[in-house]
Amino acid sequence: MKDALLATLIDEHATIEAFASLLAYEEKALVSADGMEALPQIVEQKTTLTQRLAGLEKARDAQLAGLGLPGGRKGIEMACDGDTRIASQWALLKGSTERARRKNLTIGMMIRTRMEHNRRALAILRGETGNGAMLYGPDGRLPAFGL
């Protein structure tokens, strides 16, 4: 049973590493001028990997239960106490997960910054700056010139 648990941890680690690679592609897409076309495929792949990780976590919890251990972090930490292979793989998985978490937070901040920038630019173009002048109308035309 411990061999199956080890195999699951190895699979989780590989999946997290694949997820982290996608995050790097996502970051590049967000900062490049023509990267928006790549985002739908990246999001689709991230969704697939997230679902795979959820399945692996369930498998890990079932394997822990088969060993008479509780699920989650507590159970895996208990499994690590008696097996250096599991402890080593768990440490790798935790490290990869933390790096992916930090990268995901960075990307989230990038997206929020871009959204705020776009919101402000639209407000200026719509004349929502307090001076009452509207540069562009809702249809994208210049109302002052009838264009």
What do these predicted regions represent?
Residues 2-78, 88:
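Extended, charge-rich alpha-helical scaffolding segments
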Residues 77-147:
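Short terminal interaction segments
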